[in-house]
C-alpha cells in the first residue's frame, strides 16, 4: 500500500515537472519571464528587471 502511494506521488511530481518545463521553455523564448519558477529555471530575471533581461539577451546573442 505504501509503495503504491509513493509511486503515484512520484508520477504526479514528474508530470508536473514536465508541464512546468514545457511552460518554462515557452517563457524562455520571450524576452522577459514573469513566472518565478520559470525565471529560476531559465536563469532569467523576473518582470521587474525587464531592461536588464533585454540587455542580457542582447549580450548573450553577441557571444
Swiss-Prot record:
Listed as disulfide-bonded, the cysteine pairs are 24-34, 28-39, 33-42, 38-47
Signal as UniProt keyword: yes
Where are the bilayer-spanning segments? none
Keyword Ubl conjugation in the entry? The reply is no
So which tissues is this one expressed in?
Expressed by the venom duct.
For this UniProt record, give its keywords in alphabetical order, as a comma-separated list.
Answer: Cleavage on pair of basic residues, Disulfide bond, Secreted, Signal, Toxin
Signal peptide (from-to):
1-23
Q: Which GO terms describe its cellular component?
A: extracellular region
Q: Which residues form the propeptide?
A: 53-63
Q: Where in the cell is it found?
A: Secreted
Provide the GO MF annotations for this entry.
toxin activity
Q: What is known of its domains?
A: The cysteine framework is XI (C-C-CC-CC-C-C).
Q: Which family does it belong to?
A: Belongs to the conotoxin I2 superfamily.
Per its record, how is this protein called by name? Conotoxin Lt11.1
**What is the organism of origin for this protein?**
Conus litteratus (Lettered cone)
Output the lineage of the source organism: Eukaryota, Metazoa, Spiralia, Lophotrochozoa, Mollusca
